[in-house]
Amino acid sequence: MNQCGTITAVFEFEIKQRDGRARTATFQTPRGAVTTPMFMPVGTQGTVKGISPQELLEIGSQMILANTYHLMLRPGEQLVKAHGGLPGFTAYPGPFLTDSGGFQVMSLGHMRKISEEGVVFKNHLDGSRVELTPERSIQVQEALGADVIMAFDECPPYPAERPYIEASLDRTVRWLERCHAVKTKDDQALFAIVQGGVHEDLRLKSLEATLPFATPGFAVGGLAVGESKEEMYPAVAFTAGRLPENKPRYLMGVGHPEDLVAGVALGIDMFDCVYPTRTGRFGYALTDDGRLNLNSSAPRTQLQPIDAECDCYACRHYTRAYLAHLLRAEEMLAPRMLSLHNLRYLHRLVERMRVAINGQQFHPWAADWSERYFHGNVPGWFTSAFERSTQSEI
């Protein structure tokens, strides 16, 4: 069932250091090596909103996520292919990951219909009928030319009945087999996605059916879709602890600072989320002291930067008062600078975690970070995640 063939050498994953379940590694791709743990900014339409490729490189971005669903519908994958793929189309020269389009299609609710063949949905742009199947998803992703592509899966909503989740994960495995069968390019790594909701036995069933495909990496899917942290993190710990040690582990759609720290503790290597840019556009900045609301009254007269410890352009040049003024004046520079800062904050966060892991100091570092971030009220789910992180992986 292993159809990876020659790509295993191209996509080498080398662990550098371990500290409990947390680990640092190098993941080699055709467009260069990335170091993990890492956070991937989301460029839904082929751009990280408001941020240029040069700025992404300057703040430490290593791999960008692009969205198959949106790019398939507009401008169409063939136009992207005509540019030589996503790097030529976007002018970002580094590695890309494309999602399969499954999550966006599943989010359409009544506008889509799922069958064994795939998903039929209404194009949100013009109302036309569109069909997305495992074969079509791979075809589009090969045209987009990302380094890492995702298997087409069904992400059940939360809450969902257990029989539905089980039927869904069974279908996801069958779709994975079809993705494998039609994949043609050796310079793209196909990652499989483990589903099962918050049910450990269903997660185990998904793992047992998915692991034999021996893909170059594995994703933990179907989480951060509305369940509580208390439900989510036992599922993360259970799944990550049973994934291959020598393959990258990707927790999909997760990007809050506390989630990155807890996820890394449990052995996760890769994260993505729109959170840092979306929250920046709404006037919020991420810091080690929690989220700073620049819409509130206090920052309007504060002459310090967002974060004195941050080296992003906004923190090196602007005061909180100036950025708060720009927000009130509805100037586009404000959401741009806050998005830039928030992305740099998450990149700095994983950089600091890599340093701590390499120095065998991850748990003391995380204890200090969480005490400050949560202002002394560290939530139980976070503490429990770290308790699980000291247990041996199964």
From Swiss-Prot:
Keywords: Glycosyltransferase, Metal-binding, Queuosine biosynthesis, Transferase, tRNA processing, Zinc. GO terms for cellular component: cytoplasm; cytosol. InterPro entries: ArchSynthase1/Queuine_TRR, TGT, TGT-like_sf, tRNA_ribo_trans-like. One of its GO terms (molecular function) is metal ion binding. Substrate binds at residues 99-103, 153, 195, 222. Residues 253-259, 277-281 are annotated as: RNA binding. The keyword Transferase applies. Its cofactor is Zn(2+). Pathway: tRNA modification; tRNA-queuosine biosynthesis. One of its GO terms (biological process) is queuosine biosynthetic process. It comes from the Bacteria. It catalyses: 7-aminomethyl-7-carbaguanine + guanosine(34) in tRNA = 7-aminomethyl-7-carbaguanosine(34) in tRNA + guanine. The active site is at 99 (proton acceptor), 272 (nucleophile). It holds the Pfam family TGT. Zn(2+) binds at residues 310, 312, 315, 341. Its EC number is 2.4.2.29. Binds 1 zinc ion per subunit. Homodimer. Within each dimer, one monomer is responsible for RNA recognition and catalysis, while the other monomer binds to the replacement base PreQ1. Belongs to the queuine tRNA-ribosyltransferase family. Catalyzes the base-exchange of a guanine (G) residue with the queuine precursor 7-aminomethyl-7-deazaguanine (PreQ1) at position 34 (anticodon wobble position) in tRNAs with GU(N) anticodons (tRNA-Asp, -Asn, -His and -Tyr). Catalysis occurs through a double-displacement mechanism. The nucleophile active site attacks the C1' of nucleotide 34 to detach the guanine base from the RNA, forming a covalent enzyme-RNA intermediate. The proton acceptor active site deprotonates the incoming PreQ1, allowing a nucleophilic attack on the C1' of the ribose to form the product. This is Queuine tRNA-ribosyltransferase. It comes from Deinococcus radiodurans (strain ATCC 13939 / DSM 20539 / JCM 16871 / CCUG 27074 / LMG 4051 / NBRC 15346 / NCIMB 9279 / VKM B-1422 / R1).
